[in-house]
């Protein structure tokens, strides 16, 4: 793990999930190995447990821990999905022959609005740095759901501070916003038109 604090936070998170009724199927404890380590952990909860305490059973466990929520049917799964907080990713595994297309069509709309990146038949471990990639999501997955940690050029936007200057005199504006382009090369949108003037 990244640090002692992250390792301690993961251990506390797993403990919270256990106290909320999740059953540890594997791991569950900090590792005795040197460094900031935790045993690979898998916990299980029923959909009924999750729906009864969604906030607690969504306690963040940043690291090598997963909670499997077991649903009896699609209706129960939809209730679980509707109680999800924002997440970076959501994965749906389906039959490539299409035998479960009707179920997929019910699940995806409920999941889509709760994740920044929807995957089908794929684990979310690989994140390509490309214009089409998003590694953000609705709060609390990210602090600002409009931006992503990867992806070109939008990843840089998360470091930007948005500001509006309204009725500010020309002499008080930053150079890039003055009527005269400071370099003659800077692209600017003026009255809805992109120009280098």
What are these regions (language model features)?
Residues 1-92, 102:
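NAD(P)-dependent aldehyde/semialdehyde dehydrogenase
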Residues 13, 53, 107, 159, ...:
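Generic structural signal of hydrophobic/aromatic residues within well-ordered alpha-helices
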